[in-house]
Amino acid sequence: MEPRAPPRLSVSSPRRESGATVPSHSPSTLLSCASSETATEKRRRWTGVLSVFGGVLVHVCLGTVYTWGTLAVYVVSYMRLLQIQSLQAASDASTLLERTSEEDGSSLSVFAFASAPSLVRLSDSAWVLASQFAGMTLGMPLGGIAQKTLGPCRTVILGGALMSLAVGMAPVLLHSYALFVTVFGVIQGVGLGLAYTAPLLCGLAWFPEKKGIVSGAITAGFGTGALLFSPLQAAFLNPLSIAPSQAPYASHPAELYYDVSDSDQLEILLRVPRLFRLLAVCYLLLVSAGAALLRVPAASPGVRTPGASACVFDEEAALVKSLEREEVRDETREEARATVSVRTALVSWTFWSLWTLFFLNGLAICFTASFWRLLAVDRNTRAYILTETQLALVGAAASACNAVGRLAWGHLADKRGFQTSLMGLSALWSLLLFFLPNAAPKGGLCYALAVSGSFFCLGGNFSVFPSAVASVFGPDAIGHLYGFIFGSQLASSLGFAYLTQRVAQTIGTDGLSTLMGLCTALTAMSVFCLPALSPTPRKRHSFQKQS
């Protein structure tokens, strides 16, 4: 028998574990395989990039939840107008009306009603943001379930439609604060939750090795939403930048509302219902555009057809490198599929440690998003230190920092671990919250920097915590487990709303800011001290053994 020629060096397909061999190919076949590989890789990458961009568009719409900090004074003032009109129509206290009319004119009767204890106040506006986060907490697990049957595109459109419906119904509910909170708050929040996780899952499925960057980029859209919409809303409602001037409560001189007895301020309030209708249409169009770009990679993108699954090489080292990169991606995907079950995670100390830390930072999130404008009031002059236009610019800058913070802290989580990122974020935020009550008296620039820095830290939470869940429990856990972690925001939003009713009336917004600074400081110290959050590499393997 003639001796066989030595076999040519070949690279096997992913099926090589079963012993399958791959025949050699001619140089022309090799070049065709390489070019086909390159073209396919480019198409896949662009599809992934477009899917991430679609997720950004969706989150831009969802992020308009943070425009409530700008809208609150207008909406609450309009509610007070409706309530005052109702009180005037139903009041039998004619002697009060006659006395006030004789002393100071008819406008004083309006002021008498403006200080009525039954009227909604700015401190009550915290319940709106709290109810929105509560609805998001309920909607996120439903979104994870819905996308398994409906797919990401239809799930996002369903959530966006529910959100737009809630915003569109708001004008007919402004007469009742309870109904407004239920629909504009809870139901809109459920729509937000339904549409929130699907873009993240799509992005992480395309780029599982870049958890922090992908989650940061998509959720940066959440911060950009307020950046884009807050100035537009302020320009539509208040093009002349007229500041509120009515201070009906002597014990809280910084609590200012728009005066319905002033014709210019009344004209501002009458634009509120039309704004909600316009926003409803814009939200639905924006969500639909983003959802149309969402795509999910194939179930096993590393498996190729037999004819193109392997190539033989002689001197073509470039093709070898391409296949090696594909093997690395295959290993990453196999690791991504090894996800901890919900049952195992819910009984772990790590889960409840993350839940508690998100709760503590969630209190500061609610405070920063709801009360940043109130800290711009000079307590001595009872006036804002900035004009309405300047406040809108501060809000836009803060929203930009919100978006940038998600990218920056997410990138740090990728490079140094989520523990380092979360500890640095919370420590910096604590310092800013301690300083924020004293920022306005030092000047508008100082106030703007403090607010922007606070939003820079606020945004980081929404990229660091998803990155933490993916790092500890597996990337696929974002869909079914992050919703439970986000449940801490239900507790923190309700807890903050309770604090504003019980504590804020005593310690004021300055004391509340200091209290929130203590919460974020506790988060920073807990990350450093809790053994459940120690930065052990491969921590997830211990969970997998338990499951």
Curated annotation (Swiss-Prot):
UniProt cross-references to Pfam families, sorted A to Z: MFS_1 (PF07690)
Keywords: Apicoplast, Membrane, Plastid, Pyruvate, Transmembrane, Transmembrane helix, Transport
Cytoplasmic side: 1-45
GO BP annotations listed: amino acid transmembrane transport; pyruvate transmembrane transport
Main localization of the protein described in the UniProt heading: plastid
GO CC annotations on file: apicoplast membrane
Membrane topology classification: Multi-pass membrane protein
Molecular function, one GO term: transmembrane transporter activity
Subcellular location: Plastid, Apicoplast; Membrane
Annotated region described as Disordered, given as residue ranges: 1-33
Family assignment from sequence similarity: Belongs to the major facilitator superfamily.
Name used for this protein in its record: Apicoplast pyruvate carrier 1
Organism: Toxoplasma gondii
